[in-house]
């Protein structure tokens, strides 16, 4: 990666920062910015932003798999007041990854183990043309459930599909894609009622039933997202995804894609650390807090960080200077706006750098349980269903101390 520090370069840095301690430390111990350890030293010594100002690009190679290496440069996008460096991939990951997969409708905990028999779930909220108040989803289990079993109904990622009309259902163990039993649904109230499912009542406010929208489209919550797990794992395909709630289901890509960090160099992995990442929660699921904090080595940018008007200001990180500069270059007098189209925000795919792609942000669309924000292949800032396999631009924070 990058440059090699010479004494002349060091003298220029010293002249800019007037930091004799950092200068003499670097001269004594040496550094090269062709490795990540050298870059980390620059950040720790407080001189990185002079050698690598915002807008600089750090060359790097990423291994998509054992046989495919891809050019994957990092952009320097921001420094905070503490001198921490923020980096973001210039290109998007080469393959699509859902923000989150459609979830199970019901799961069994230790106190609620269903025996073989007929059950029904009343529909309490209209949703699209498919979910009709007054109908009930009826199905018959042929075997007893054990703790952790999930009942998953294939709703076709379409709220206009009626879940009572001959829809396939399966019982899975948490994290498994192997069906333990299966059948099809009917509209009826025979057997035992498991409760009434609503559109936004999840997070155990409605027993063990999920929210309708999350059953159809998945969840827009960053902390529980599949893409967050993918970005923060070194594990091979089939080993990086674990359920984050009782209803959580793996995306198909979990079985075929290696964790993102598994393609990064050992030098890079040795200098990144988990950092607190704050993300706003949606307003429809009854959370007591407006935000939550995760601890991530890799994260996706938020609306705020990309200098886009956020739904909840001042919580999802700082305005990154890189995007402030892009807004100025685009002739804006303020921030990019939700719903606006900005060609300057178009992202191209790593390994195919003439192909514009749509990239997820980590910000939830706060008015729904199942949406997250993205910037599409035309530069349009929008939100969409979590199940969709968009790309993303990994970001990280190199700590100054």
List each model region and its residues:
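Intrinsic-disorder/low-complexity peptide segments enriched for small residues
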Residues: 8-9, 37, 112, 139, ...
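Autoprocessing Asn-cyclization modules and mimics
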Residues: 104-147
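Short, low-complexity N-terminal tether/leader segments at secretion or assembly junctions of large
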Residues: 1-17
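Collagenous Gly-X-Y triple-helix signature in extracellular proteins
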Residues: 16-107, 146, 154-401
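Intrinsically disordered, low-complexity regions of eukaryotic proteins
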Residues: 9, 111-113, 151, 160
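Terminal low-complexity, poorly structured segments
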Residues: 6-7, 23, 109-110, 117-119, ...
């Amino acid at each position: 990666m990058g440059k090699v520090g010479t004494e002349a370069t060091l003298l220029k840095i010293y002249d800019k920062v007037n930091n004799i301690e950092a200068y003499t430390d670097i001269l004594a111990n040496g550094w090269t910015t062709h490795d990540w350890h050298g870059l980390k030293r620059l950040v720790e010594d407080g001189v990185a932003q002079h050698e690598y100002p915002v807008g600089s690009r750090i060359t790097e190679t990423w291994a998509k798999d054992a046989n495919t290496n891809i050019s994957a440069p990092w952009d320097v996008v921001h420094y905070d007041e503490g001198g921490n460096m923020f980096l973001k991939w210039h290109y998007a990951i080469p393959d699509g990854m859902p923000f989150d997969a459609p979830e199970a409708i019901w799961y069994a905990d230790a106190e609620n183990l269903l025996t073989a028999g007929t059950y029904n779930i009343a529909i309490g909220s209209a949703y699209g043309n498919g979910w009709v108040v007054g109908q009930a989803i009826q199905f018959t289990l042929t075997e007893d459930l054990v703790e952790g079993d999930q009942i998953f109904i294939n709703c076709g990622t379409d709220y206009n599909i009626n879940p009572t009309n001959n829809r396939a259902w399966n019982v899975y163990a948490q994290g498994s894609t192997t069906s333990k039993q299966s059948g099809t649904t009917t509209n009826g109230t025979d057997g035992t009622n498991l409760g009434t499912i609503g559109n936004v009542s999840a997070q155990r406010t409605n027993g063990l039933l999920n929210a309708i929208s999350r059953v159809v489209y998945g969840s827009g919550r960053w902390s529980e997202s599949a893409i967050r797990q993918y970005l923060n794992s070194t594990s091979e395909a089939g080993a990086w995804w674990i359920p984050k709630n009782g209803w959580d289901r793996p995306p198909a890509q979990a079985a075929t894609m290696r964790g993102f960090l598994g393609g990064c160099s050992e030098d890079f992995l040795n200098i990144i650390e988990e950092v607190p990442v704050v993300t706003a929660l949606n307003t429809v699921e009854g959370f007591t807090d407006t935000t939550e904090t995760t601890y991530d080595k890799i994260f996706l940018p938020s609306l705020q960080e990309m200098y886009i008007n956020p739904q909840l200001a001042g919580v999802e990180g700082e305005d990154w200077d890189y995007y402030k500069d892009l807004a100025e270059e685009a002739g804006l007098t303020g921030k990019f706006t939700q719903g606006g189209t900005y060609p300057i925000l178009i992202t191209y795919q790593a390994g195919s750098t003439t192909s514009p792609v749509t990239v997820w942000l980590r910000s939830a669309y706060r008015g729904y349980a199942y949406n997250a924000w993205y910037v599409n292949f035309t530069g349009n800032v929008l939100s969409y269903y979590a199940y969709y396999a968009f790309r993303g631009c990994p970001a990280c924070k190199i700590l100054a101390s």
